[in-house]
Amino acid sequence: MTKKKAHKPGSATIALNKRARHEYFIEEEFEAGLALQGWEVKSLRAGKANIGDSYVILKDGEAYLFGANFQPLNVASTHVVCDPTRTRKLLLNQRELDNLYGRINRDGYTVVALSLYWKNAWCKVKIGVAKGKKQHDKRSDLKEREWQLDKARIMKNAGR
């Protein structure tokens, strides 16, 4: 008999969109389900997903994830046509959809995918209402991050 693998608490994340946090101010985050096909679930379990260029479009009262790339596995069904970049419907409550509509109608706001993760047996995507950063904002964030690292390094060495 084989032993079940121990579930690590930090291993539920499938994919992160680090570029979104660099290029946007994230104002509010939502959790949404994804309407997936069978081969997509298999590729997600194998960790073959990329949401680096993905964004959310609200159309006809529904939300869709564009630009997410789920690479199909070689062992996936041969009778199913696998489109890695197809648009996927996001599963949100009507109240959440109305909230998103109201927020992105303002100038300069958009909705981006932040992370893709497992919650129990369900695949969820964390989306955020975002406003684009200017170049000087990105530079100041970089300086702040470097200062935090230097500060931590100084505090670590001060205790010796």
Curated annotation (Swiss-Prot):
InterPro entries xref list: SmpB, SsrA-bd_prot, SsrA-bd_prot_CS
One MF term in the entry's GO annotations: RNA binding
Protein's UniProt keywords contain Cytoplasm: yes
Keyword set includes Cytoplasm: yes
Keywords for the protein's UniProt record, in alphabetical order: Cytoplasm, RNA-binding
Principal localisation: cytoplasm
A GO CC term assigned to this protein in UniProt: cytosol
GO biological process, one term: trans-translation
Pfam families (UniProt xref): SmpB (PF01668)
Compartments in which it is found: Cytoplasm
NCBIfam families the UniProt entry points to: PRK05422.1, smpB
UniProt xrefs under PANTHER family: SSRA-BINDING PROTEIN, TMRNA-BINDING COMPONENT OF TRANS-TRANSLATION TAGGING COMPLEX
Function text: Required for rescue of stalled ribosomes mediated by trans-translation. Binds to transfer-messenger RNA (tmRNA), required for stable association of tmRNA with ribosomes. tmRNA and SmpB together mimic tRNA shape, replacing the anticodon stem-loop with SmpB. tmRNA is encoded by the ssrA gene; the 2 termini fold to resemble tRNA(Ala) and it encodes a 'tag peptide', a short internal open reading frame. During trans-translation Ala-aminoacylated tmRNA acts like a tRNA, entering the A-site of stalled ribosomes, displacing the stalled mRNA.
Family per record: Belongs to the SmpB family.
Name of this chain's protein: SsrA-binding protein
Organism annotation: Cronobacter sakazakii (strain ATCC BAA-894)
Underlying gene: smpB
